[in-house]
Amino acid sequence: MGTSLLCWVVLGFLGTDHTGAGVSQSPRYKVTKRGQDVALRCDPISGHVSLYWYRQALGQGPEFLTYFNYEAQQDKSGLPNDRFSAERPEGSISTLTIQRTEQRDSAMYRCASSL
């Protein structure tokens, strides 16, 4: 009988509960099989026009991914490759999508907003 190695990709958010005073992110945690697509959602503070996505791998500092001003993506230089994309179509809620997840995508994904 052969053995197979099943790799899981673990994605997570901190502070995902919406308190009315902060950014809301969902899902709170996401565990998926390698090769699956994942969409992470960020609902910024009401009235904030700028939105930022970051990721933080275990034992590492935060790494910038992308930045929006209203719905316009101003800087996507931190998106690691073409499997990562982000959108903010109406200048409010943003979605970060990771296609065909890989083990190296395991990290804490965070968003932040500002005026």
Curated annotation (Swiss-Prot):
Biological-process GO terms, alphabetical: adaptive immune response; cell surface receptor signaling pathway
Compartments in which it is found: Cell membrane
InterPro entries given in the database record: Ig-like_dom, Ig-like_dom_sf, Ig-like_fold, Ig_V-set, TCR_beta_variable
Cellular-component GO terms for this entry: plasma membrane; T cell receptor complex
Cysteine pairings via disulfide bonds: C42-C111
SUPFAM superfamilies named in the record: Immunoglobulin (SSF48726)
Species per Swiss-Prot/TrEMBL record: Homo sapiens
Protein name: T cell receptor beta variable 7-6
